[in-house]
């Protein structure tokens, strides 16, 4: 049986997602992100184009590592302003039948008990088309604005995430038995208390004694995405994820990443072929190669170098403003997204990376 290619669109509820500066293009529509029709039109387009899903990114905080402030991110609309992604799902589901939705939501700042209810509600309303991109927040600005002095250390964030998932699994899978909902009009009994159980979770980070507030949804546990590519992040993905998102900058890096993920999945006792790996690709289309190249060059003319530096500085925790554009990158261990540094500076030794480009 031939293997299928799965296609997810990649969006964010903001003006500038991963192409900072393109909002200034005269044909750009991203400033309409505040309008419901923008999102329902996109959902219809993706369904008509046979896409499998729409993956919606998110951050809670601003990119303020570059020059020690958020001015570049704000002036260049580098993922700010940014609206909540969750509210987009239901209206897009209402105008489609098959399109899946991957919701990015950080577990760093929300207790699993109310979050479980949100996910189950979305699973009901989408009729089983919701997925969750499990992320641990990495922006220090987000932690500070929620009363924390700093983020947890990188690997500790995944320890916290492991327990978070255990609470959710207990709520989704163990609280309500199959057949707990009776809807018995004659006896006037809606649910059987004997088939609904308290989870009685007591752990290092959470104590959740009660039952899940939602009756079982179509999937119970939504499809789990994971985008961490550090060693600890890949171990977490191997234990939990059904879909792994990577952003490999070369075929060499991608081959290494996929092989490593599948090996770790097998070591975790799971079937590695049942874990889908999605790689980030930016595709520019044209009727001919020449027209596609011309369109690409046109788009590049709007690139904001300052906005791009704000993003990569936030992703890595390194102020790239201190480097020359032609300065070679070296591997640096940071507490932000470790994989962002590893991919550029150590994963592919055949390439030399600078702040602007790579050289073979």
Name these PLM-found stretches:
Residues 23-36, 105-113, 220-231, 284-286:
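Active-site mouth loops of central-metabolism enzymes
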Residues 26-33, 74-79, 102-110, 151-155, ...:
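The substrate-binding groove and active-site-proximal loops of carbohydrate-active enzymes
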Residues 358-359:
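Conserved small/polar residues in nucleotide/adenosyl-binding loops
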Residues 5-9, 54-56, 101-105, 130-134, ...:
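Hydrophobic faces of well-ordered beta-strands that scaffold small-molecule active sites
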Residues 3-4, 111-240, 267-268, 273, ...:
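Internal, glycine-rich beta/alpha segment that forms the wall or movable "lid"
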Residues 277-291:
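Short, conserved secondary-structure transition motifs
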């Amino acid at each position: 049986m031939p293997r299928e290619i799965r296609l997810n669109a990649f969006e964010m509820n903001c003006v500038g997602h991963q192409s900072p500066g393109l909002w200034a293009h005269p044909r750009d529509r991203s400033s309409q992100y505040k309008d419901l029709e923008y999102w329902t039109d996109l959902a219809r387009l993706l369904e008509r184009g046979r896409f499998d899903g729409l993956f919606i990114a998110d951050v809670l905080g601003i990119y303020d590592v570059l020059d020690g402030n958020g001015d570049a991110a704000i002036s260049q609309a580098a993922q700010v302003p940014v609206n909540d992604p969750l509210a987009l799902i239901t209206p897009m589901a209402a105008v489609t039948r098959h399109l899946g939705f991957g919701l990015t939501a950080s577990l760093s700042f929300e207790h699993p008990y109310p979050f479980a209810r949100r996910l189950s509600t979305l699973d009901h309303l989408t009729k089983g088309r919701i997925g969750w991109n499990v992320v641990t927040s990495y922006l220090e600005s987000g932690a500070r604005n929620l009363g924390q002095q700093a983020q947890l250390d990188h690997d500790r964030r995944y320890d916290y995430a492991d327990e978070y998932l255990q609470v959710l699994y207990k709520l989704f899978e163990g609280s309500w038995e199959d057949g707990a909902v009776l809807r018995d009009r004659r006896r006037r009994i809606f649910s059987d208390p004997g088939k609904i159980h308290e989870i009685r979770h007591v752990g290092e980070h959470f104590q959740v004694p009660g039952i899940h507030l939602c009756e079982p949804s179509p999937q119970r546990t939504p499809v789990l995405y994971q985008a961490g590519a550090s060693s600890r992040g890949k171990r977490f993905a191997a234990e939990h994820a059904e879909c792994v998102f990577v952003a490999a900058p070369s075929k060499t890096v991608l081959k290494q990443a996929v092989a490593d993920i599948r090996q770790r999945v097998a070591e975790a006792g799971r079937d590695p072929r049942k874990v889908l790996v999605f790689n980030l690709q930016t595709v520019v289309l044209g009727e001919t190669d020449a027209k596609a190249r011309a369109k690409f060059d046109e788009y590049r003319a709007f690139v904001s170098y300052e906005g791009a530096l704000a993003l990569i500085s936030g992703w890595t925790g390194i102020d790239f403003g201190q480097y020359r554009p032609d300065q070679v990158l070296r591997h640096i261990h940071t507490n932000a997204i470790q994989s962002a540094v590893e991919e550029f500076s150590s994963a592919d030794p055949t390439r030399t990376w600078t702040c602007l480009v790579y050289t073979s």
